[in-house]
Structure formats: structure tokens, C-alpha cells
Amino acid sequence: MIAGYIFLLIAILSEAAAAAMLKISDGFARWQPSVLVVIGYGLAFYMMSLTLQVIPLSLSYATWSGAGTVLTAIIGVLWFQEKLNRRNIAGIICLVSGVVLINLS
């Protein structure tokens, strides 16, 4: 079971990194970040496929999408100086709460 969560963590991290590279790629106009987008998403989906061998789909996908969304928002704030308003923050709190509750069940 621990291996499944390690695979899931790698899937989340690589998906968020790929999303950041997608922004940097400037619509795939810059080839270096574009290559990293493909590698990042490829790794994310491969790790997710390994995760699904151990952790049920409902738990895996909810965690992957929720944690990935939160991590991507954090990257947006830290690297791209994006601003979060109160609704954004409330949404992130809801996502984190949902991911925690799903994993506790």
C-alpha cells in the first residue's frame, strides 16, 4: 500500500510540474519546456497507472486531482506571482479537506 502512495505522490508532483512547464512553454512555442510538459504528463499518467494497481480508482483519482489542483495553485502563486482571492482560498481549503476525508475513509 505504501508503494501505491509513493506512485501517487510522484504522479501528483509530475503533473503539477508539467502544468507549470505548460505555462512556461508559451503555447508550445518554446521547445524545451514543451518537452518537459510531455515528459511530466507522461510520467504522471504512468505513475497513476501503477497507483491504480494498488489503490482504488475513486480514492486515487480524487487525491490526484485535488492535490494536483492545490499544488498547481501554490506554484502559480510562488513562481508566477498569481493572486488568490478569498474564494480561491476557500476552494483550496475545501479541496484539501475533501482529499483528507476521502483518504481517512
Curated annotation (Swiss-Prot):
It is a multi-pass membrane protein. It is found in: Cell membrane. Keywords: Cell membrane, Membrane, Transmembrane, Transmembrane helix, Transport. The chain crosses the membrane at residues 2-22, 35-55, 60-80, 87-104. Gene3D superfamilies: 1.10.3730.20. InterPro entries: Small_drug/metabolite_transptr, Small_multidrug_res. It comes from the Bacteria. Part of a multidrug efflux pump. Confers resistance to cationic lipophilic dyes such as ethidium bromide, acriflavine, pyronine Y and safranin O. The efflux is probably coupled to an influx of protons. Belongs to the drug/metabolite transporter (DMT) superfamily. Small multidrug resistance (SMR) (TC 2.A.7.1) family. EbrA/EbrB subfamily. This is Multidrug resistance protein EbrA.
